[in-house]
Amino acid sequence: MSKEIALTLDSRKRLGSTYLKLTKPKVVALMLVTAIVGMSLAPVTDFPWIQASIGLIGIGLMAGSAAAFNHLIDRRIDARMARTHTRPLPSGDTNPLSVAIFAVAIGVVGFVLLYAWVNELTAWMTFLSLLGYAVVYTMYLKRATPQNIVIAGIAGAMPPLLGWTAVTGELHGNAWLLVMIIFIWTPPHFWALAIHRVEDYRKVDIPMLPVTHGIEYTKTSILLYTVLLTLVCVMPVLVGMVGFIYLFSALLLNAGFIYHAWKLKFAPEPNSAIETFKFSIYHLLALFVALLADHYIGMVLQ
């Protein structure tokens, strides 16, 4: 009897792990960090903790739903790529119908939470972001143009704005600046990975930039985008959102990103592309933590 219980528990753990993987939890976690920053920087006199918490849950569920739809739609090309062939669907850990039901279910729950307990604006904007990633990007742009990441990057850049609207119920230019940071960060982040996995993308006929325009062109594009990103990252300081702590951190982090991009272009080593990709993740996380730290330290010192 105890053996049967142990087997049942083990089976449930594996099932839970499978469905957690479908939501791309690390990606969603980073998105939620940026949403928290959007909430924290929003000008509210009495912070709505319960509303904000429900907002994070709703945004997280809908982001997880978009990720699950991505797994579902891309299952055939995932099976042929070295980076993705062990994902739940290609590996046979689950089936398309179950993934579709799961994606719809958590998406609906997330939307209802946002619509009923946060505000309609956040619910609909999060839904549009889901459509942008799962439908516009995954179903069309990814397979249609090498500018797929550039055009669809807005969908993945929305969490700071969603966090802002979750606690204020309104759009604001400062929140769009946070969106712009992620929007400009996205192409060099993904293009570095695309260089590292260029043969994978070529094999499945996905027109990523290094496949269509060549690796050297892509390296140049990455370097130019990191310079542009540095300029965009200064803008929150110029409008008075944050101060010196963030400015120093942003300049340091962007210098690191430019260094990796420069090295990738002019002094590449076998792992330069994947190292640039990995650094970009730490860059974005640290940048938004710096926004948060500057904001709260500034409040204490006032």
Swiss-Prot record:
The protein's superkingdom reads Bacteria
The primary location reported for this protein is: membrane
Q: What class of enzyme is it?
A: transferase
Tell me what topology the record assigns in the membrane.
Multi-pass membrane protein
Q: Which InterPro entries match?
A: Protohaem_IX_farnesylTrfase, UbiA_prenyltransferase, UbiA_prenylTrfase_CS, UbiA_sf
* Record PANTHER family: 4-HYDROXYBENZOATE SOLANESYLTRANSFERASE, PROTOHEME IX FARNESYLTRANSFERASE, MITOCHONDRIAL
The species is: Vibrio parahaemolyticus serotype O3:K6 (strain RIMD 2210633)
Please state what the protein is called.
Protoheme IX farnesyltransferase 1
| Family membership noted in the UniProt record | Belongs to the UbiA prenyltransferase family. Protoheme IX farnesyltransferase subfamily.
HAMAP family this protein is in? Answer: CyoE_CtaB
So what EC number does this one have?
2.5.1.141
Membrane-spanning segments = 27-47, 49-69, 98-118, 121-141, 149-169, 175-195, 228-248, 281-301
The alphabetical list of record keywords is: Cell inner membrane, Cell membrane, Heme biosynthesis, Membrane, Transferase, Transmembrane, Transmembrane helix
UniProt GO molecular function = protoheme IX farnesyltransferase activity
**GO terms classed as biological process:** heme O biosynthetic process
| Functional note | Converts heme B (protoheme IX) to heme O by substitution of the vinyl group on carbon 2 of heme B porphyrin ring with a hydroxyethyl farnesyl side group.
List the pathway annotation: Porphyrin-containing compound metabolism; heme O biosynthesis; heme O from protoheme: step 1/1
Extract one GO cellular component term from the record. plasma membrane
Q: What more does the entry say? A: Carbon 2 of the heme B porphyrin ring is defined according to the Fischer nomenclature.
- What is its subcellular localisation? Cell inner membrane
Q: Name one Pfam family in it.
A: UbiA
The reaction(s) this protein catalyses:
heme b + (2E,6E)-farnesyl diphosphate + H2O = Fe(II)-heme o + diphosphate
